[in-house]
Amino acid sequence: MPKNKGKGGKNRRRGKNENEQKRELQFKEEGQEYAQVLRMLGNGRLEASCFDGEKRLCHISGRLRKKEWINNGDIILIQLRDYQNDKADVILRYNVDEARNLKTYGELPETARINETDAFDDVEDIPFEFVAEDDIDIDTL
């Protein structure tokens, strides 16, 4: 067996994906629709609820599969198929800022829930009631 003398494999040579720069907001065109991911099915497929009221099985294209991670609740842009109404292809995933901009421009309905990273900030507001052990009577329990 050869000894490992290197500093890593092909993923290290490839480097990190550092393209966090702002990109131009892409609106839907004819034959495209906005959708929200309901659940990931695996094998490059997901179930999405489109904002036209339909549920569709979507296929993640190869250029998005390893580069952009899609999670439940993400807002995506899908290309509708001409021959299958219940299936579509994922074109683009919007980040939280882009989805918020789409909502302010009126492209997404007001009822659309956008994934927030600070969803659990109000956990501190849960009241707890502490009772002293002297007040508890075992017979009444």
Curated annotation (Swiss-Prot):
GO molecular function: RNA binding; translation initiation factor activity
Biased composition (Basic residues): 1-15
GO CC entries: cytoplasm
InterPro entries: NA-bd_OB-fold, RNA-binding_domain_S1_IF1, TIF_eIF-1A, TIF_eIF-1A_CS
Pfam families reported in the protein's UniProt record: eIF-1a
PROSITE patterns: IF1A, S1_IF1_TYPE
Keywords: Initiation factor, Protein biosynthesis
Listed GO biological process terms: translational initiation
Keyword Protein biosynthesis recorded: yes
Region (Disordered): 1-28
Domain S1-like, residue spans: 21-95
HAMAP family, A to Z: aIF_1A
Summary of the function given for this chain in its UniProt record: Seems to be required for maximal rate of protein biosynthesis. Enhances ribosome dissociation into subunits and stabilizes the binding of the initiator Met-tRNA(I) to 40 S ribosomal subunits.
Protein's recorded name: Eukaryotic translation initiation factor 1A
Organism: Dictyostelium discoideum
Gene this chain is encoded by: eif1a
